[in-house]
């Protein structure tokens, strides 16, 4: 079972400036939702952003320790904009 802190640390190991919030959707530690804010996402498409995150998670995906991840990937500027819009 993957802990929230382990998931955050895995993501931050590849996206060192990332601010990460995670939520276990099922209580089983294998279905997660994440909001990830990183300057590394600048100029990248949604698919490219998700690929960066999946690179960080290869080890737990390969072992099925992580089965599903829903994510929102934002640059710091996009995050600030979403806060000001109340979303």
Q: Would you name each region that the model predicts?
A:
Residues 7, 11, 49-64:
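Short, non-transmembrane amphipathic alpha-helical segments
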Residues 23, 35-37, 72-74:
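Solvent-exposed beta-strand sheet faces enriched in polar/charged residues
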């Amino acid at each position: 079972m993957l802990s929230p802190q382990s998931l955050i640390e895995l993501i931050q190991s590849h996206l060192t400036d990332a601010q990460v919030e995670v939520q276990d959707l099922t209580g089983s530690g294998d279905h997660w939702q994440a909001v990830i804010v990183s300057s590394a996402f600048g100029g990248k498409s949604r698919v490219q952003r998700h690929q960066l995150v999946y690179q960080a998670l290869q080890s737990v995906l390969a072992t099925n320790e992580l089965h599903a991840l829903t994510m929102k990937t934002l640059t710091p500027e996009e995050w600030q904009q979403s806060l000001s819009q109340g979303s």
